[in-house]
């Protein structure tokens, strides 16, 4: 139905637009022919047609919008009813054993019923429910252990702020990252693992060399330096011996290579006292002196 209405409105708007175009052309022709009175009448008719067409279009759009709104409200209501039915069927199908016994209160109020107004079927149902509640109470008392922590009677007072800001004391700092507000709120979780004691390893100490320290009063003994006396080389003495028989002269070196320091000194003293070799008679030469 909505599609047909939209098609009708579109066709009516097209017709009105065509008529407006024709009227504009006619009015322009009348102004050219200097027929002002007729042109004024045509313009007034044109204005009336425009106003009526606008009013009709507005009414049509309002009606279509209301129809859409009603459709949406109906769909929302149907969805709500459908979800409510599903929830009710789920609650009826779920057995009571699935309900957590720890969440139920330990004390249950007794059920007061008038025996005159209750049928036998309802009595059996109430008896069954009371038995179930008793069984739940016993199971909850067995499973729940008494808490060792002493609970304070007076609850902690919350800070009275306009924004109802609460400090979370058990936010781990590992979640925060780079957020400074989270770091100001969070707390580090203490690890339950026992800390290992640091083992002290024995370190090998370096051996210190003991040196005999000298007394500052006793002067240090200087090592004696050995005086090395180099032998002084003296010039070699050359002696020339002349034989009477031959005229050849022989040169005899009197210095041997293995002379000590003492022999050199003795040789120097004897060389001065001894006469020349010409005066000393040799064994090879015969003595020229006549024996007396």
Swiss-Prot record:
Biased composition (Basic residues): 148-157
Positions annotated with a glycan in the UniProt record: 70, 72, 81, 86, 92, 100, 113, 138-139, 141, 199, 203, 232, 236, 254, 271, 276, 284
Region (Binding to host heparan sulfate): 187-198
Chain ranges on the Cytoplasmic side, renumbered to this chain: 1-37
Keywords, sorted A to Z: Disulfide bond, Glycoprotein, Host cell membrane, Host membrane, Host-virus interaction, Membrane, Secreted, Transmembrane, Transmembrane helix, Viral attachment to host cell, Viral immunoevasion, Virion, Virus entry into host cell
InterPro entries for the chain: G_prot (IPR000925)
Extracellular side: 67-292
Biased composition annotated in UniProt, kind: Polar residues: 99-142, 245-292
Keyword Disulfide bond carried by entry: yes
Disulphide bridges, residue numbers: 173-186, 176-182
Ranges annotated as spanning the membrane: 38-66
Domain of life: Viruses
Cleavage (site feature) positions: 65-66
One GO CC term on file: virion membrane
Biased composition (Low complexity): 200-210, 229-238
Region annotation Disordered: where it falls in the sequence: 92-161, 189-292
GO BP term, pick one: symbiont entry into host cell
Annotated Basic and acidic residues bias: 212-227
UniProt similarity note: Belongs to the pneumoviruses glycoprotein G family.
Descriptive protein name: Major surface glycoprotein G
Organism annotation: Human respiratory syncytial virus B (strain 8/60)
């Amino acid at each position: 139905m909505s599609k047909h209405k939209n098609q009708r409105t579109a066709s009516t708007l097209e017709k009105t637009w065509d008529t407006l175009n024709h009227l504009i052309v006619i009015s322009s022709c009348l102004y050219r022919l200097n027929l002002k009175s007729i042109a004024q009448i045509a313009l007034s008719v044109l204005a009336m047609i425009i106003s009526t067409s606008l009013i009709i279009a507005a009414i049509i759009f309002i009606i279509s919008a209301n129809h859409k709104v009603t459709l949406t409200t109906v769909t929302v209501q149907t969805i709500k009813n459908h979800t409510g039915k599903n929830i009710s069927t789920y609650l009826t199908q779920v057995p009571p054993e699935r309900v957590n016994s720890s969440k139920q209160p330990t004390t249950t109020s007794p059920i007061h019923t008038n025996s005159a107004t209750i049928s036998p079927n309802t009595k059996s149902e109430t008896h069954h429910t009371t038995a179930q509640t008793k069984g739940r109470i016993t199971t909850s008392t067995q499973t729940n252990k008494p808490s060792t922590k002493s609970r304070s009677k007076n609850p902690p007072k919350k800070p009275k702020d306009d924004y109802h800001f609460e400090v979370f004391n058990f936010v781990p700092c590992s979640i925060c990252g780079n957020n400074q507000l989270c770091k100001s709120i969070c707390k580090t979780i203490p690890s339950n693992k026992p800390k290992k004691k640091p083992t002290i390893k024995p370190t090998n100490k370096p051996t210190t060399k003991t040196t005999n320290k000298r007394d500052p009063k006793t002067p240090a003994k200087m090592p004696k330096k050995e005086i090395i006396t180099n032998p002084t080389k003296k010039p070699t003495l050359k002696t020339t011996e002349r034989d009477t028989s031959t005229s050849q002269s022989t040169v005899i070196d009197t210095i041997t290579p293995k002379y000590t320091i003492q022999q050199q000194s003795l040789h120097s003293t004897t060389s001065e006292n001894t006469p020349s070799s010409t005066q000393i008679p040799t064994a090879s030469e015969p003595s020229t002196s006549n024996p007396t």
